[in-house]
Structures are given as structure tokens and as C-alpha cells.
Amino acid sequence: MQAWRIRVRGQVQGVGFRPFVWQLARARGLRGVVLNDAEGVLIRVAGDLGDFAAALRDQAPPLARVDAVEVTAAVCDDLPEGFQIAASGAAGAETRVTPDAATCPDCLAEIRGEGRRRGYAFTNCTHCGPRFSILQSLPYDRARTTMAPFAMCPACRAEYEDPADRRFHAQPIACPDCGPRLWLEAGGAELPGDAIGLAAARLKAGEILAVKGLGGFHLACDATNADAVDLLRARKRRPAKPFALMAREEDLARIVAVSPAALAALRDPAAPIVLMPARGSLPETLAPGMAELGVMLPYTPLHHLLLDAFGGVLVMTSGNLSGAPQVIGNDEAREKLSAFADAFLMHDRAIARRLDDSVVRVDPPMVLRRARGQVPGTLPLPPGFETAPQIVAYGGQMKAALCLIKTGQALLGHHLGELDEALTWEAFLQADADYAALFDHRPQAVAVDLHPDFRASRHGAARAGRLGVPLIAVQHHHAHLAACLGENLWPKDGGKVAVIVLDGLGLGPDGTVWGGELLLGDYKGFERVAWLKPAPLIGGDRAQIEPWRNALVRLDAAGLSDLADRLFPAAPRDLARQLAAKGINAPLSSSAGRLFDAVAACLGICPMRQSYEGEAAMRLESLAADTGPVPDLPCVGGAIDPAPLFQLLAAGERPDRVAHALHASLAQAFAAEARRLIEAGQAEAVALTGGCFQNSRLATMTRNFLADQGILTQGRIPANDGGLALGQALVAAAKLESN
């Protein structure tokens, strides 16, 4: 009888893949064995395969991702009669980590049905439920998760041991008799009664609840109750930053415009927050000045039960102090969230690691924040990087996330936040140690941002010194370039690409602050071809939060000082101009982000101070009309001059048309310069990256101006600094080889 050795690679551990193989094999009368190992899943089988190999890919379980099915003839004299799943142990241990997944339809039907899990908030199976958020160490089994304290009852044990059951080896398996417990507490005491019903009643009464979710606590309130929303804003001291919402699918159509692509994203097992056009049926204070709302579907049984009992739409925003990481522990929540929440919906299953909600857009598709449900999935490295050494890269100061390279794959870590916040810095250090231990990573090089004062850069330098391995400092926008190429699997020797990088800031090799760049390069190096005409950042970092400073210098440069004086009468203009003239705490910057701030300030959008990062630019995007003037921005000696945009203001153009002009003119100017490189044969393709390209209007316009060119964009990896570490790691790998 012919025997075969079948190797399956991808996300195939912890997703019910072995029982799936067992069922396929038994249905086809095959004999053999299936097991997990360090490379994925290994199948040793004898008999007529027929469509068996194709079915492994085509009929895989919902959470599986099959990257490769490799079939080779083999001699398998020791195969058992029938088909077996290898017992747990070194061979059978699950060594890959799967992201957390939203409740599957079968489990949802159970909690709404009449069986033993009716109304049970911790129902899960191999197709859904917690994974990364409960994992404490590898291999992945119950004893190494936060489910270890909960001994299985006989009924759960029987399901766990039955290969025909969808809970076969589901490590978080639980039921009301043996699993975690849910309760509501207020005033330091647990309240008697149905926790879900009590919580829903309090939400209907306008109270704010702290709700323990999958990767941390949320603060929840009735999204239709303007007083409750205002109270939450006052308590959190969060005057304008948009709140995320949670809604059942049947409630979506009345609050947002749901496209087929948005619905698909909402239903994805990652269950991200999806940005969609608002219908105007909810209080404007949910997202002041924004045309979109961020909405997610319930993604745990607890959320489904709560939304069913409440019967409406909830605000579901991170449970944290302003700027601090999301709270994950019960005692921590009682200590830190009591000033915000009237009551706590809590449980006794511990959260092993903090995971924020992921955030996506769908038009065009892009990940804005990569976290719960999307990590820790691995990414294949582009051709040419197969033998890259183990590298750790630490990203930047904002939207921090680290990246590991190992065995031809990259593992981009979860969103951590801004590293200038002390608690976020602690979380960063914990994540560094956590990932190194969890994935047995032993770096042979360390990559950091070129800016030596970034906390992550200093940390990386210290670690490289301790390990005695090379430290590779990567220019900020070169890292963005490489991250975009890497996501698109651009070969290491695939030729140079014209890359438009528009973002907030990054230290340039010339000592100025970059942020509006056209680069020509690859993983190994780059040259700067065009850039936004630099302007001083008056007050340094203060220019990032006070848009009038950027407006003042741009208006002055356009010969419109009188207009600046009229627009900003209360600002210390004379002092600011003196600092700019003398170059005192006023570094030159080509930042596109600060140009958006400047135009927004001129239009009266938070001119004196932004209440959160990106507020001015986001509100400007929402304001922009669909049509309007598109003034040409001259490019002289590589410097693109935005002065004509400010002339529109002086001419009295409508604010929405000025906002349109900024997007269209900036897109047109950089697209024209990129096109020249393509037409001259200097570049093989054009790429768009940097945080400004998370502005869907800017991204779409730039793509339209380059419609007949090969365009590389980022969809699965954040174009903002959340993807920076991947680019750093790839640049480091390329430089190590070339050296």
C-alpha cells in the first residue's frame, strides 16, 4: 500500500486542525497518524489519497490558514490500523500561537439555546475563543494558560477527549459547572442576582460600567444617551477623541452605512473595530467633527449576552487612565477605574497579556491598529530573506510594536502605545521579555530607529551591548519604505521603488525632521528625491499639539502674515516668529502631518490645541468636499511648496473646498514626482506608506493619480509607526548580508 508524508504549514495549531484531518482520513478509509511539531502539522498516511491533500486546504477549519501542503512518497511500515491523533507530548505539543477569535455561530447558538451552556459567558470551542490573551507559556495546553485553575468536569472532559467533538483539545473549554464565574459588583460588594441582567439595567439607567473583556477592561455606556456619553467624557477627561461602539449586526444599518466589505471585516474572526460612515442617528459627541464611527460586533459570549439583554448600541472604550495602557486585572480595575465606573462586570479568568481592539478601514482596506485577533500571526519574509538571522526590531516612540525575525518569518507584535507614558513603557519592557521567552528568540542583531533619544532606541542599544551583537540604526522613513515592500513580498533584489512616505515626523540623516518624502530605494538603502518644503517646528514638540504654530510659519512663508495675525490674535505670534528667525527650538521639518495641522488651524479646526494625536488632520479629512480646486504645488530643487494652498484661504475659498484642495494637491504633487522616476526607468514600482496614508481620501486620490502604475500599499500591516519595526528588521537583515 502506498504511503505518504504530508507536511501542512501555516496557522494550523490550536484551531482544530488535527481532528479535522482525523475526520477527513476516516471518511476516506485512510490509515495513519497526525501530529503537531515545530513546523506545523505532520501527517503520515497510507492508502489512496484521492482529494485528501486538496481537502486539507479547501475545507480547513475556520481559524486555520494553510500556507503550504507538501506531499512526498514515504515508507511508513509502523502506521497503526485506522487513523489516530498523536498523544500530547514533545511530538504533539502545540508550539505555534493562534490569535484570539470571535465567538463562532455554533457557540453562539449554544448560549442562546436550551443546553447546559445556555447563558454561559465563557463558552468556546476549537473554532473560537481566547488563545493569545490567556497563554502564559508554550507549548499551548491548559496547564500553561490562565484556565489552569479550572479543573474540567466529567462532561467537559468527555468533549475534550473526543476527536469527533468540536471541543477536542480546546484548551479553554468550560461550562457553568467547572469554568470561570461572572458577577457584577458596585460599592466594593458583589451584587446578588443575574449579573448580565443587572448590568443591562444599570446601562439603561445611564450608568457607566467597567466590563472585563478578552484583552482588558472596557468602559461602557448607552451610546444613545448623550448625558451618559458626556459623563464618560468628563470622567475620562477625554473631550473629543472618538469613542468606539459595540453593536449587534441587526442594529448596524441605523447607525452607520455598512458596505459589503465592511460587513465582511466586522464578521472576521478578529472582530476588529471598523470605521464606517455615520448616519447621524447617534449623539454627535460620540465622535465630534468626524464623518465616521468606529464600530465592532460583540466578540465574546459575555458581549453577546450583554448586548442581547441591553437591546441597543453601547460605547465600548478602553478602560484606562488617559494615555495609560488598558487595565487587565480585577484589583487593578477596582483601583484605577473606580473614578470612571459606577459598577464592574467582572470574572475570574485572568488575562495573561493586554490586547487592545484592532482597528481597520475597508475603503481602501487597511489596518490602523494591529492587536486583538490579529496577533501573534506570523508573516512570510520576501524572497531573498529565507536565511536571515534572528533579529529583534523595536520600532519608534509612537504606536510602539516590536518585531522578531526567525526561520524565514516575521512576527510583528501587538500595539502597545506611546512610549513617553511610564505605564506604557513598562508594558513595552514586559512585551519584549514575553515575546523573547514565548518564541525562544535569540537575536543575532538588534534594529532601532535612527533617533538616539527614542526610548526604544536606547533600550535596543543597551540590549545589543549586553548580547554583544550588532546594533543597526535605521532611518525612520527607510523603515516605512521597507515595511511596505515587505508586506508586498517585494524581493530583496527586486529593484528600486519610488516610495511616497507621508507622516508626522522622523529624524532625517541631515539632522532635520522629515515627514513628507519621495524616496527612491530598496531594503539596503535609499536616496531622497523630493520633499515638502521645510518649515520650522516652533517650540519643537509643542508644534505637534498646537496647530497654530504650523499655520503661522506656512502663512508667513506664503506672504500672508496679515492673515495669520487675523486668524490667531491670541497666540504669541511675535515671540514665535523670533524663535523661528533665530532657529531657537525651531527645527526645520518637511512633515506632511504638520501641513495638515496648519491648514486645519487656518480653517478653525482646534487651532490652539489638539486634545488627541491626529485630531486636526482627522477632522480635516471629514470636512473635505468631494470636489474643488487643485492648485499646482511647484517643485523647485526637489522641494514641493504648499504656498498655493494658503493663497486659497486668502481668496476666501470655502473651508470644505480648501480641505479638498490640500488632499488633492498633495497627492498630485507627489504622484507627479514619482511618475517621473518610473518614466525615467529609475523605479520598478511606486509605494505609498506613512501614517498620513491612513487618511482614506489622501490614499485614494494618490492611487488615482498613479492609476496606470504598479502601486504597492499596506493593508495588513499598519502604514503608521505600528509597522515600523517590520521595516527596521528587514533593513537590518539586508544590511547584515551586504556587509
From Swiss-Prot:
Alphabetic keyword roster: Ligase, Metal-binding, Zinc, Zinc-finger
Positions of C4-type zinc fingers: 104-128, 153-178
Record-level Gene Ontology MF annotations: carboxyl- or carbamoyltransferase activity; double-stranded RNA binding; ligase activity; zinc ion binding
Metal-binding found in the keyword field: yes
InterPro entries registered for this protein in UniProt: Acylphosphatase-like_dom, Acylphosphatase-like_dom_sf, Acylphosphatase_CS, Carbamoyltrans_HypF-like, Carbamoyltransferase_HypF, DHBP_synth_RibB-like_a/b_dom, HypF_C, HypF_C_2
Top-level lineage group: Bacteria
SUPFAM superfamilies, alphabetized: Acylphosphatase/BLUF domain-like, YrdC/RibB
Ranges of residues in domain Acylphosphatase-like: 3-87
Pfam families recorded: Acylphosphatase, HypF_C, HypF_C_2, Sua5_yciO_yrdC, zf-HYPF
Domain YrdC-like: 193-373
NCBIfam families: hypF (TIGR00143)
PANTHER family cross-referenced by the UniProt entry: CARBAMOYLTRANSFERASE, CARBAMOYLTRANSFERASE HYPF
Primary role: Involved in the maturation of [NiFe] hydrogenases. Along with HypE, it catalyzes the synthesis of the CN ligands of the active site iron of [NiFe]-hydrogenases. HypF functions as a carbamoyl transferase using carbamoylphosphate as a substrate and transferring the carboxamido moiety in an ATP-dependent reaction to the thiolate of the C-terminal cysteine of HypE yielding a protein-S-carboxamide.
Family statement: Belongs to the carbamoyltransferase HypF family.
Name used for this protein in its record: Carbamoyltransferase HypF
